[in-house]
Regions:
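Domain-level signature for soluble enzymes in the chorismate/prephenate branch of the shikimate pathway
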Residues: 1-177
Length: 177
């Protein structure tokens, strides 16, 4: 019997990937470039389930998702709440005093804005948190960092400079299945 597939938007190490791994351990995870593709692979039968974030108690609604949900014919079968723990990370050898830029998803940046300001970093939006971590890994510029999950730091070989970088510790995102 072949394993079932659960899709998510983003790269490996994204928070949606963490939710897939936590609640659907017997499934193969399928990263998708966009929310639309994440849903399309369920519609066309490639995946059995899709995990999508819909709102965060700090950053609010994930606007793209609410628009897409109005136009799909899939059924919501579950919801999961996941505590988001953002970590500030950079390449090995980089330290806090050398940082100038931070990359992450717009929601992650808004959830860490006070800490970003304390470090006097320029923030730049990226498609997803794991994508930002991969970007930092492949970037030769000095002083760049990402805000992403611990899993992303492990996957992309980055050093965590500050754990739990979010401004508020009770940072919860609601995901629909």
């Amino acid at each position: 019997m072949s394993k079932k597939i659960v899709s998510f938007q983003g790269l490996e190490g994204a928070y949606s990937d963490l939710v897939c791994r936590k609640f659907y351990k017997n499934f193969i995870t399928l990263p998708c470039d966009t929310f639309q593709k994440t849903l399309d692979v369920v519609t066309n039968g490639t995946a059995e389930l899709a995990i999508i974030p819909v709102e965060n108690n700090i950053a609010g609604r994930v606007a793209d998702m609410h628009f897409l949900l109005e136009n799909i014919r899939l059924k919501i079968v579950a919801e999961h709440y996941h505590k988001i723990e953002h970590h500030l990370m950079a390449k090995k050898g980089c330290d806090l005093k050398n940082l100038r830029k931070v990359y992450s998803h717009t929601h992650a940046i808004s959830q860490c804005k006070r800490n970003i300001k304390k470090l006097n970093l320029n923030s730049f939006n990226y498609m997803d948190t794991a994508g930002a971590a991969k970007f930092v890994k492949n970037n030769n510029e000095q002083g760049v960092s990402a805000i992403a999950s611990k899993l992303a730091s492990e996957i992309y070989g980055l050093k965590i400079l500050i754990e739990n970088f979010e401004d508020k510790s009770e940072n919860i995102t609601r995901f629909l299945v």
